[in-house]
Amino acid sequence: MSKISFKGDLKEGIKIIIDPNLNWDEIRNLIVDEIKSKEGFLKGSSIYVDFQGKDIKDEDWQEFRKEIYEKYGIMLSKELYRLRISNSNNAKIVLGPIRSGKSLNVKDNLLVIGDVNSGSEIICNKNVFVLGKVRGSIWAGYENNDKATIFALELEPEKIQIARYILDLSKIKKEKTGVGYWVYVENGEVKLNRYSGGKKNG
């Protein structure tokens, strides 16, 4: 196989597959070269990196993710594509960022592969999954569906709401552990937890 291969698919998302025989420096350089060559297309998106079982030090990975996001506005993940929307036939998938000033209204589940920029809004009656950073507003379960949930890699929102419940934004804390945030309603209150490897950390 080639040392690195890039694949993009609306159902499976955008991913980079890595030859596990490469060392970390080679992997870093190849990913950067791949992103540079497609920067215009990829900016504001999220990419799943498949290391095919190769063990990567978490501190190296987190430092690299931060570097890529700051330079190119691209969020890398090696965990998140374990998530699946249960009925893909009833899900809307948006590839690329939701830009400022845009309003997106969806009846079914929504998967956004990219950022939700400030000044934009998402209104969705079911679950919202954002493989990127939320800076705008999200209202899930707008028809009083308090079973709806929101997932995002990063949260710096203007507003988060599920059904009639609004998240207290002061609850959002930046942590090094976990790969994203779950937002859901429990006992009449919007709760927020970090997500890590298939479980929510309270």
From Swiss-Prot:
Top-rank taxon, per record: Bacteria
Keywords: Cell cycle, Cell division, Septation
BP terms from Gene Ontology: cell morphogenesis; division septum assembly; regulation of cell division; regulation of cell septum assembly
Protein name: Probable septum site-determining protein MinC
Family: Belongs to the MinC family.
Organism: Dictyoglomus turgidum (strain DSM 6724 / Z-1310)
InterPro entries in alphabetical order: CAP/MinC_C, MinC, MinC_C_sf, MinC_N, Septum_form_inhib_MinC_C
Complexes and interactors: Interacts with MinD and FtsZ.
Lineage: Bacteria, Pseudomonadati, Dictyoglomota, Dictyoglomia, Dictyoglomales
